[in-house]
Amino acid sequence: MNQAIAKQDRPVDLLKATINAPSIQEQFKNALGEHKDTFVASLIDLYTGDKSLQTCKPSAIIIEALRAATLRLPLNKALGFAYIVVYNNSVKVTNEQTGREEWIKVPTPTFIPGYKGYIQLAMRTGQYRTINADVVYEGEVRKVNKLTGEIAFDGEKTSDKIIGYFCYFELLNGFSKTLYVTVEDMAAYAKRYSPSVKKETTVAQLIAKANDGIIGKKVGWEGNFNDMA
């Protein structure tokens, strides 16, 4: 009997119990239709393989998963369309023993579209002829026109060193735009604005991740810098 209770208390069992609630099932069905079961299965797989997610309340995870479901973006790390990232947010609570207010860290799941997800959402509008994004290697940037914002990437690649990232889009009406950010600027941005980057992580360490060829198990800048960029 004790073993049965312990099994029921496993985090994944608590998540499944929450998902199986009729109201939650209805929300997933409304968002996904016949694809509901596949999406829920991928959510459970994601949760089972991510210890940080297991520290969060199941109800909070499902709220974020429903956001992905509403946008019809799969929650599969390997696909890169959408992620649920855990941030340790500061929350003010009242200490029951002292009666005083204090700040504590609470693991908070957060839905974040991946770059492939953003591209898919944009293409669904029917307004884009082309959308592309990729890394830029040393030697490929031939010319940058500050006045017009035009950038020529037709230079000869001289090494496998990643020096930056670009994105390009063209609308059906002919308007087009190219954006380019260096690895250094991207690392500085991540360090300054991303809650997922540890305080002790330096900009230099983030820059190194762009070229170390290592894809970590974590989601975010420290797990896969180039995908985030």
What does each model-found stretch correspond to?
Residues V12, K16-A229:
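Binding-interface segments
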